[in-house]
Amino acid sequence: MHTAALKQNLLRNLSNLPGWRTRRHIVVIESDDWGSIRMASHESFRRLRDAGLPVERSHYNRFDGLESDDDLAFLMETLAEFRDSTGRPPVITGVNVVANPDFDRIREEGFAAYRYEPYTRTLQRYPAHAHVEALWHEAADRRLIVPAFHGREHLNAARWMRALRGGNRSTLLAFECGVTGIPRRGIGGEEVPNFQAAFDLDTTADLADQQEVLRSGLALFEQLHGRRARYFVPTNGYFNGSL
């Protein structure tokens, strides 16, 4: 292992020293990106692939999409089949985003400003997602899947808007397909910025936008889930200490 990697690993372990400890043997099951669009549809996948974007090389682009009624119902059914020594089922921490880009409104306004919509509105555009919101509430009430905060959306909105306004071909095509998370090497080898890291910085001016993302995202989380977020995992791990 390189020196830099060793140092990073050591610092990560040291940062955990002040945290909570127990002698119990606990298995933590954490699953993230709930509520987020990754690949909007099979048609979007084919269109991007046929245009030369190597989406087929990314397991996220191949398999990740907005959770459906069946996804949650089958997962809850599976979890409920198991019990620990006290009779309790396993609990998954479902790390959620609560919004997605409002592609239609952004397009209508000529990319003048970023707009977002609650993920519950995104669900309305999908054919088998009518009960997702209710299933989340049921899962939390039954202590099967408990929501945690991942960010407002799984998107660095300021960086994404700069790429759209700058005419990045791959980003513009993905926009037309309702997709934001695409490979870093785009059409014809075009460089594509990392849009998934919502709290990464290009300039210090982005901090003000990110503060608003946190404020509005946490408020929306509480509104949608009926509880305040107690746990936060930044998308892709990037997070500035001044936030």
Residue ranges, per PLM feature:
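Catalytic alpha-helical scaffold of carbohydrate-active enzymes acting on polysaccharides/glycoconjugates
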Residues: 2-231, 237-243
